[in-house]
């Protein structure tokens, strides 16, 4: 295993939220993806698209961060990496069986336009697996909220209901959803790690992942810091 693979594993998998977040989306997608063409929208270095590729998918990752993609090409399971805008995807209609997007839509000025493009390139019956910032209690801690939004360029936040409406308008039916960091304590943890720790903080807090997961299982699936959704194109 190359050093770049070790660094990518540590950055993506040893992480208090990404491990569960992207791992859940991939679990929903399925273990056997042979014969499937999968697009990761705003996939950075393509690590998670690469994990879909390991399951047999013909995986493609798009992003505008050239440096991340240059790094991604050094990974052992690198997908096809294409530099392009998520709001203007360079693919024909119905090109993909599944679309993955991990906490990307909140960074777009026009989240609806990004969903337009995802729906366009998705085959009928194909599915979207995505997550988004919710920050349902963020107004309780305005300094943490504002710092998080400024640090990560969060333009909008979404709930499963607001995503359901946007998706329905684009011919997509919500199949299921799941909130993460559902309790007040874990939501504050999420914002505090974001504000004061950044990526290093999220990585260092990885040992807390089982405790956050346990708290989530005991709380209603109604609110949280992040929402995961699966939707199917009509």
State each model region's role:
Residues 1-88, 100, 115, 224-227:
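Conserved N-terminal segment of class I S-adenosyl-L-methionine
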Residues 98-109:
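A short SAM/SAH-binding and catalytic strip from SAM-dependent methyltransferases
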Residues 108-113, 139-140:
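Short N-terminal helix/helix-N-cap motif within the alpha/beta-hydrolase-1
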Residues 112-127:
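A short glycine-rich, Lys/Arg-flanked "PGG" loop and its adjoining helix->strand segment in the class I
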Residues 133-154:
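Short, glycine-/aromatic-enriched active-site segment of Class I SAM-dependent methyltransferases
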Residues 143, 176-234:
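A C-terminal cap/extension of S-adenosyl-L-methionine-dependent methyltransferases
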Residues 155-171, 177:
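Short alpha-helix
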